[in-house]
Amino acid sequence: MKNILLLGAGLSASTLIKYLLDHSIAENWQLHAVDQDLQMLQSKLGGHPNAIAHSFNALDSEVRKPYIEKADLVISMLPAIYHVGVAQDCIALKKNLITPSYISDEMRALDANAKAAGIVIMNEIGVDPGIDHMSAMKIIHQIQEEGATLLSFKSYCGGLIAPVSDTNQWHYKFTWNPRNVVLAGQGAAAIYKEAGALKYLPYHRLFQQTEFISVPNYGQFEAYANRNSISYLETYGLQDLPTIIRGTLRVPPFCAGWNALIQLGLTEDTYTIQNDGSFTPRMLLNTFIPFKDQRSVEQKLAAFLGENADLLPLFEEIGLFDANYVFKATVATPAQYLQELLEKAWKLGPTDNDMLVMYHEFIYEKAGKNFKIESSMVAIGQDQRFTAMSDTVGLPVAIAAKLILNQTIQRKGVTLPVYKEIYQPILSELEQYG
């Protein structure tokens, strides 16, 4: 019997666990799953005979090493900052590893050691990154095999709320880490390539300079640029590609509303504001409106927004005009106060379903003519456990686990799923899930 060690069984692991257990008898697997929330973990394992629940500090190398040593494959669903430590343990113990997260510079530096240990460390095998890579590379390789020249590649993905559960004017609810949403785009300019030229898009313009796209049967979405698109030129073997843009999808008017919050300063996370025990959202908002006259907060905000004053209902809906609610935090950054409000306004309800939308656009030249291919994927969650995010992250990880254990994937070292021998069988099986 082959042992699979799963470190972390949180939000995105439900579908992964189900797949591993559903296939465990036929594949002769035993799943050892680890999470500090033992009750939640046992609920997900459902008393399956091929599953064993463990509750210990998976962040402690000395504690987890004995479990890694007994495993044939390790899957880390821990926060991304802990993957390198797990990878170092796997190299020392010569155990294969899968993570759904981006390859960090520290992880990439382990490539030679992983190859020397004869193991694969598979990263970026979730949805974004993951399915986006695989679905893109399939089409890129097809274009190249036709003797055509790729001119432009744009790729967008977004974790959103399903239309049936869309009940607010922002058309958004938290389906992922709220803090990551509030701080999205901060820290450095977005970099992409357009018509052969590098473009830098600073944070204060990120949600202004957006692109609208349409997905069949789901309408219009708006995309803002991700942090670094040009790193994927090498990843995809497209160093000479004139245009590459990767971005995140939202539903209008989200980007316009979020841009207004940025311009006000409400997403700032570099300084704190004291709460004397009476600090309300209305007071927070008034702090950032640059007018000293006696007009109401609403009137001053309308003046600040100018031609975008029609965004006022968005501010009202998330509670920024509220003069009764008192913030719980005693001291916080503007972004943290904003997050406290948004976690109330954008909380996923018990019957809400999430939605994952992915869109690719390829423009290529063949025989003197330009052609365009559009490719899209929409996944809608089943319920609060088997969400669209859980499905689209968990299934690729699970299928990759099977392929590694069955030695279908032979590649060693630190890698990602941009190679045919990896993406073809994974995409083929994913198609069975729609």
Where are these regions (language model features)?
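Rossmann-fold cofactor-recognition segment
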Residues: G47-D60
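N-terminal Rossmann-like NAD(P) cofactor-binding module of classical short-chain dehydrogenase/reductase
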Residues: D72-S76, L97-T99
